[in-house]
Amino acid sequence: MKLLVTAATPAEINAIKKWIKAANIKKNLDIDYLCCWIGNYETILNLENYISKYSEPIFIRNIWICGYWNHENQKKNIPIQAATTFNIHTEKEFVIPPFAQIAPMRNCFSSEKPIKEKPYLKKEIECINDEWYFDMESRWTEFVSLKHKLPHIILKVPLDFVWQETIDLYDNKWKFIWKDVADCLEKLPYHDYLQKIIEWIESQ
C-alpha cells in the first residue's frame, strides 16, 4: 500500500519530507508527497488528480497547521487528530473512521475562507474538551478520501489563536510566520506516527 503524505504548501511538504526521512523507518514503505495548496477547491482538485493516476490502494496522511479558539485549554503546537470534520457553512458534521490513532482526537471545523473569529452556529456543537480547531481543508480531504474509500488520517498542528497571532498589525491582513510553521512540524514524532500506520497497514 502506498502512503500519501499531503500538506498545504511546498514549505510544509519540504519540512515534513526532511523529518520523515530522518525517522529512518526500516520497513519497505512506499511514500509519496503531495502539495495540495491552501483552500478547499485546490485540495479537492489536487487529491483527485493524484488518486486518478493509481490503481493500487493508498493510505492518505494529511498533516497541516490549523487555527484554534480555546486559548485557555490548548497547549500550543501539540498536534491533534481530527475525529470529526464540521462544515461551518452547512453545519453538517462527518465522523472520520478511526483507521489508526496517532494523536489526541478532536473536532475540526472547516471553512471556505480564512476565519477571523469563532463562527456563530445555529446548531449546538459539543467539542471534545471544549477545544475548537479551524482550517479550510480537512472537510474536503475527508470528502475525497471517503468517495474513493481510502483509509486516511487528518493530523492538525495548532499554530495560531484565531486571527490574533498571525495577523499583520499594519495592513490587517492574515500572514503566516513560516519559521513558526517549520518549528511546529520539526517537533512531530514522525517515527511513532509511521510505526502506527505501518501496524495498521500490516493488520489488513
PLM feature segments, named:
Residues M1-L4:
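Extreme N-terminal starter segment of soluble prokaryotic enzymes
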Residues A8-P10, S138:
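Helix N-cap/beta->alpha junction signal
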Residues A15-I25:
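Short, aromatic/basic amphipathic alpha-helical patches
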Residues N24-Q204:
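Glycine-rich phosphate- or other oxyanion-binding loops that anchor nucleotides, phosphorylated ligands
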Residues A11-I16, E42:
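Short N-terminal binding/cap micro-motifs at the start of the first secondary-structure element
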